[in-house]
Amino acid sequence: MRILVLEDDRVQQGRIEQTLLDIGRSRNLRLEIDIAKNYGDVEKYSQYFDNYQLYLLDLEIDGERERGFQVAQQVRERDPFTSIVFVSTHSEALPLAFRYHLSALDFISKDQSEEDYRHQLERCLDYVLAVSYTHLRAHETVLD
């Protein structure tokens, strides 16, 4: 599974990457994780938007509070069905996701316990795997 993380805080970058890698190891999953540290990095990775199955986006990037929503809009323009999860301390901004019509899979608060944080990430990975498997099976059925 290919994942793009948008996070500008180094501590949080390490936290999310390590948690994902731990989950991947415990479940024998092959995870390819790219980390965009700022909006400029997102532009660099945007040519590969079609290749990611999951986006984990912080809301506030480079001091701009809605930057994560703007990135999610760009992703949606290229792929209306991919999974987007917001990972942030700004839970009060979550209603804005509806204004942007982003169909986010989840919102993960950075302020929760490590156990809850990991559990939410696991549930998101499980969902993406299930959807990918369903699409693969549907594709195989069409080919048969």
Locate each region found by the language model.
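Acidic, metal-coordinating helix/loop segments flanking the phosphotransfer/catalytic sites
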Residues: 17-18, 35-54
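Non-catalytic signal-transmission and effector/linker regions of two-component phosphorelay proteins
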Residues: 1-2
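Conserved acidic carboxylate
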Residues: 7
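Single conserved hydrophobic/aromatic residue that forms the stacking wall/gate
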Residues: 135-144
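CheY-like receiver
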Residues: 52-129
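Short hydrophobic/Thr-rich beta-strand motif most characteristic of the beta2 strand and flanking loop
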Residues: 25-39
